């Protein structure tokens, strides 16, 4: 039995069985006590899969006693892109879900200087986000996966950051894995402007080739000016995604 596990040591003990192969999604264990609990919790499993290459390499380096393998996160082939795929873009930027604070500040500054910028932003309402365009037009709550993907598909540019970048998340213990949103941006034909710290996971997903990495506002502005006016290279995106479908 295959089982996804979001948080390895916060999950129930029910996955520690000889007939279960668990796959760890968010692996943030670094402390000795956390690691010992992780080993104990899955010591009966014949194989333990680690989605993050960064976390997998870390476990190999400390001689993890479990039988571990790297199984990267992927995206469904129902969204497959080919050389003839076309994208109808409506907005320069669509910001979905939780955002990196630096990229959000950069976009705010950019839109003040370039008042023709079109973008979508979200406001938290309870456990969900409600989305609005730059004029304040209410676009609704994107309550389904397809709503989410359809809105993202209308964006020319995606702003992406790994979870711990710029103190975005403090629970990752320094791990900065690539999240599914990166592949979602690619499969929806978005240019990606990114902030990340290079590690084995960002290398695995080739962020250096598939995104424009920025540090300063000036770099952000230059990237926005360029990418707002360009279509993505669908052939290159299609070739890249063939390595990352489920």
Description of each model-found segment:
Residues 25, 73, 214-216:
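Active-site donor-binding loop signature of nucleotide-sugar glycosyltransferases
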Residues 215, 225-246:
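A charged, aromatic-enriched C-terminal amphipathic alpha-helix characteristic of glycosyltransferases
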Residues 29-30, 219:
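Short acidic loop-to-helix transition motifs that present clustered carboxylates
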Residues 58-59, 222-228:
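C-terminal helix of von Willebrand factor
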Residues 1-3:
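PLD-like (HKD) phosphodiesterase/transphosphatidyltransferase domain
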Residues 17-24:
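Short beta-strand/loop segments at the ligand-binding rim of alpha/beta enzyme cores
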């Amino acid at each position: 039995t295959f089982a996804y596990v979001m948080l390895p040591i916060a999950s129930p003990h029910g996955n520690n069985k000889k007939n279960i192969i668990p796959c760890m999604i968010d692996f943030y264990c670094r402390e000795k006590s956390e690691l010992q609990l992780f080993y104990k919790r899955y010591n009966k499993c014949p194989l333990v899969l680690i989605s993050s290459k960064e976390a997998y390499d870390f476990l190999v380096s400390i001689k993890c006693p479990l039988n571990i393998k790297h199984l990267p996160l992927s995206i469904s082939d129902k969204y497959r892109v080919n050389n003839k795929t076309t994208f109808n873009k409506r907005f320069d930027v669509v910001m979905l879900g939780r955002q990196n604070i630096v990229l959000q500040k950069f976009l705010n500054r950019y839109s003040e200087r370039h008042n023709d910028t079109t973008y979508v932003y979200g406001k938290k309402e309870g456990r969900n986000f409600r989305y609005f365009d730059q004029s304040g037009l209410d676009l609704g709550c994107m309550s389904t996966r397809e709503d989410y993907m359809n809105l993202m598909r209308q964006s020319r540019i995606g702003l992406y950051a790994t979870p711990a970048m710029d103190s975005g998340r403090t629970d990752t213990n320094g791990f900065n894995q690539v999240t599914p949103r990166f592949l979602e941006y690619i499969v929806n034909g978005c240019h990606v402007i990114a902030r990340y710290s290079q590690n084995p996971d960002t290398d695995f997903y080739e962020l250096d080739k598939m995104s424009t990495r920025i540090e300063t506002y000036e770099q952000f502005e230059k990237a926005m000016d360029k990418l707002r006016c360009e279509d993505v290279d669908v052939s290159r995106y299609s070739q890249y995604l063939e390595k990352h479908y489920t």
